[in-house]
Amino acid sequence: MGVKGLNQLIKEHSPSAYKEFQLKNLFGRKVAIDASMCLYQFLIAVRQSDGQQLTNEDGETTSHLSGMFYRTIKMVENNIKPVYVFDGKPPVLKGGELEKRLLRREEAQKQKTALGDEGTVEEVLKFEKRLVRVTREQNEEAKKLLQLMGIPCVDAPCEAEAQCAELARGGKVYAAASEDMDTLCYEPPFLLRHLTFSEARKMPIDQIEYKDAIAGLDMTKEQFIDLCILLGCDYCESIKGIGQATAFKLIKEHGSLDNIVEWIKNNKTKYTLPENWPYDEARQLFMNPEVTNASEINLKWKEPDVDGLIEFMVKQKGFSEDRIRSGAEKLKKGLKGGVQGRLDGFFKVVKTDDKKRKADPKESKASKKKKK
């Protein structure tokens, strides 16, 4: 679900926190990717010409494997080293959001069934995409594929995006990559969005710098988390009638969500607090997420197991052997070279005062005389 309206607020108040670039601009970087999020994207986006998901001869869905294989290779070819982080058990507070998603899928199924044979291809596809969910089996298949590709995986104890942020904060990777804006609540130095999107979509990668984002909003870490909860997150519903502009204004005026709650309770306002609203529990989940300390995680990129890839992807899943072998060669080449150093990793960029940059006219004349 993410945090509704947060993207726009940061763009409005912290434009310097945003950068847009292409995949190649991340060369030399290690990135922790929210695996569950990108598997969901692959199941929706990787389709046949008729709009149906990719399947093998046995009718098993293979869109997630195709997307994971080729997008990972594209990153490695650009000298990027990905690590995929998988969700663990969901927090108890997330149960309400998961139940809502289930109800939305059930409603989509009813609407699709109601169309019968009279619905257009576009209408049917719209409801089919709403029915998409990543199964446990698909998660395990993705892990197996990545292992054979030589790409490291991490099983998070709880939320994958929190673990991605921990790896970034701990210096194991450069950034956390996820489409969920609430990843910023876990303080990754950088959040990357659209990293696993197909290049055919021609959508640049967004980079958001956490430090610049909260500086532009002029908020503390605690106020930023309160803002995200007020906007609506996976852990608790939002307050009806409070959108992004009002949420920002209220945090500025009252300083904290506790004060806002008291203000709503003690004054005749048009806002009504949800019954038993667990905002403080949600805050604690963001402040103290259940993660494995980055220092305890050892990330290793290995040479791909070509025979294993052929057995799994070709013999079991029905992919083209030529394409899998070609992909494996690209992986070998990319991973063998290692991550090349970036210039900004060796040199510290120092801003030069414009006045100092301009040569003194007297000095210039003097130097010319010496040359003569």
Curated annotation (Swiss-Prot):
Biased composition (Basic and acidic residues): 353-366
Cofactor: Mg(2+)
Post-translational modification: Phosphorylated. Phosphorylation upon DNA damage induces relocalization to the nuclear plasma.
EC number: 3.1.-.-
Keywords recorded for this protein, A-Z: DNA damage, DNA repair, DNA replication, Endonuclease, Exonuclease, Hydrolase, Magnesium, Metal-binding, Mitochondrion, Nuclease, Nucleus, Phosphoprotein
Ranges where the record places region Interaction with PCNA: 339-347
CC annotations in GO: cytoplasm; mitochondrion; nucleolus; nucleoplasm; nucleus
GO molecular function: 5'-3' exonuclease activity; 5'-flap endonuclease activity; DNA binding; magnesium ion binding
Statement: the UniProt record of this protein carries the keyword Nuclease: yes
Pfam families: XPG_I, XPG_N
Region (N-domain): 1-105
Binding site for Mg(2+) 1: 34, 87, 159, 161
Main enzyme class: hydrolase
Cofactor note: Binds 2 magnesium ions per subunit. They probably participate in the reaction catalyzed by the enzyme. May bind an additional third magnesium ion after substrate binding.
Binding site for DNA: 47, 71, 159, 232, 234
Compartment list: Nucleus, Nucleolus; Nucleus, Nucleoplasm; Mitochondrion
Main location: nucleus
I-domain: annotated segments: 123-254
Residue numbers spanned by region Disordered: 353-372
Binding-site residues, Mg(2+) 2: 180, 182, 234
Assembly and interaction partners: Interacts with PCNA. Three molecules of RAD27 bind to one PCNA trimer with each molecule binding to one PCNA monomer. PCNA stimulates the nuclease activity without altering cleavage specificity.
Family: Belongs to the XPG/RAD2 endonuclease family. FEN1 subfamily.
Function description: Structure-specific nuclease with 5'-flap endonuclease and 5'-3' exonuclease activities involved in DNA replication and repair. During DNA replication, cleaves the 5'-overhanging flap structure that is generated by displacement synthesis when DNA polymerase encounters the 5'-end of a downstream Okazaki fragment. It enters the flap from the 5'-end and then tracks to cleave the flap base, leaving a nick for ligation. Also involved in the long patch base excision repair (LP-BER) pathway, by cleaving within the apurinic/apyrimidinic (AP) site-terminated flap.
Full protein name: Flap endonuclease 1
Organism this protein belongs to: Candida albicans (strain SC5314 / ATCC MYA-2876) (Yeast)
